[in-house]
Amino acid sequence: MKRHGILRIFPFPFESTPMTLTELLIPTYRQMLQALGVWLRKAEAQVEDADALMAARLAPDMFPLSTQVRFACVQAYEGVHRLRHESMPPALEALLDEGRNGGDHPGTMAEALARVDEALAFLGTLAPDALDAGAGRPLELGLPMGLTFDLDGEGYARDWALSQFYFHLMTAYAILRNQRVELGKADYVQHMFAFLRPATAPAG
């Protein structure tokens, strides 16, 4: 039986093994939402009125930080529910509404951090194969403006779920940098330090 997944390539002499959708998406969602939490906590420590950051935007026609945080969380929830062919729960619809209303009601830094922590807690409950059955299933992706896309689970993960997740995540990062919060590449890829060869770490 063909195993759906994206190939995970190891240097010789290891053999290639397929990476399942769960192995691809859930660690990605978790490590990047953890990073988002770190960015927000750094902003909270550096900026006197951190709550004011929630209303900050990159451009007048873009959603504020408050919305970007919530929509990044939404993408993680939505990816899981769509790939398991589940209806979107009321709590997710409420989070979407909270994000859409971020311009008028940006909320507080503490509330934004709570949304990130809630999403991480949800991801932590998933089984190691939680999404795998959805890899080859047909999936209908409907958008509010009436557009509908027909994909399978793998195409949805590659072409929509990850790109949307990173869009909102990176917009949040860019807003914080634009507001002079001190962040760097190490804050963005902090998960990579788990793989750092000790002898290559900078001295000091």
Residue ranges of model-derived segments:
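Mature, function-bearing regions of proteins
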Residues: 15, 19, 26-30, 89-92, ...
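C-terminal or internal capping secondary-structure element at the end of a domain, subdomain, or sheet
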Residues: 154-199
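Acidic interhelical loop/turn segments
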Residues: 47-55, 124-157, 189
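Short, Lys/Arg-enriched N-terminal segments with co-localized hydrophobic residues
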Residues: 4-18
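Generic recognition of stable, solvent-exposed alpha-helical segments in well-folded globular domains
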Residues: 24-35, 71, 114, 167, ...
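Conserved alpha-helical segments that form or flank metal/cofactor-binding pockets of metalloenzymes
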Residues: 62-96
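Generic N-terminal segment detector
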Residues: 18-52, 60-66
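Structural signal for well-ordered, non-membrane alpha-helices
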Residues: 33, 37-44, 77-80, 117-124, ...
